[in-house]
Amino acid sequence: MKSLQTICLLFIFIARGTSDKCEICHGFGDDCDGYQEECPSPEDRCGKILIDIALAPVSFRATHKNCFSSSICKLGRVDIHVWDGVYIRGRTNCCDNDQCEDQPLPGLPLSLQNGLYCPGAFGIFTEDSTEHEVKCRGTETMCLDLVGYRQESYAGNITYNIKGCVSSCPLVTLSERGHEGRKNDLKKVECREALKPASSD
């Protein structure tokens, strides 16, 4: 995977908490410091998200604090197995002020392949991405397909296409997505049962 894709993806999934002002920042590591900004409706919640791209034993982590609509807060915890052994993990925490607490990002579980598989994709700046087969592990019994874009002043429109194995489906749906002042739009959120290999008989 290209390093540019890795850096850009670290700042895609964001959230916010109910407040007049929220801290705005993004950076590598577990925390960041920034500036206060008023949060107009519908982006009227403060939030903090940790994004981790993990290829055991190495991981790249970033933090983003911003104002967002409550629909994105429903993403909560997302662990997507996008390539064999490669995970994109996000922890979104919304709160009523700009000091949102972290949700834990424990180490990747050691689990065996469970015989299921999903289409996998990891695309940035495009809604199209070449698919490959991801062999699901452990409790990963669902396939997630996520397409959307995020508008940021530092990077413009970041379009993304992410597919892979997940243990559970995120609560957010397209009917609840909201356009967040045209800054964030989920164009596709599909979650279905993982596939079984075709019988050799």
Curated annotation (Swiss-Prot):
SUPFAM superfamilies: Snake toxin-like
InterPro entries: CNF-like_PLA2_Inhibitor, LY6_UPA_recep-like, PLipase_A2-inh_b-type, PLipase_A2_inh_N, Snake_toxin-like_sf
Cellular component terms per the entry's GO annotation: extracellular region
Disulfide bonds: 22-46, 25-32, 39-67, 73-94, 95-100, 118-143, 136-165, 169-191
GO molecular function, one term: phospholipase A2 inhibitor activity
Signal peptide: 1-19
Glycan-carrying positions: 157
Tissues and organs where the protein is expressed, per its UniProt entry: Expressed by the liver.
Keywords linked to the UniProt accession: Disulfide bond, Glycoprotein, Phospholipase A2 inhibitor, Secreted, Signal
Keyword Signal attributed: yes
Superkingdom, natural source: Eukaryota
Pfam family, one: UPAR_LY6
Subcellular location: Secreted
PTM entry text: Glycosylated.
Subunit architecture: Homohexamer.
The family this protein is said to belong to: Belongs to the CNF-like-inhibitor family.
Role, per record: Inhibits the enzymatic activity of phospholipase A2 (PA2). Binds to the major PLA2 toxin of D.russelli siamensis (Daboiatoxin, AC Q7T2R1, and AC Q7T3T5) at 1-2-fold molar excess of inhibitor to toxin. It exhibits broad spectra in neutralizing the toxicity of various snake venoms and toxins and inhibits the formation of edema in mice. May bind to PLA2 through its proline-rich hydrophobic core region.
Protein's name according to its UniProt entry: Phospholipase A2 inhibitor PIP
Organism: Malayopython reticulatus (Reticulate python)
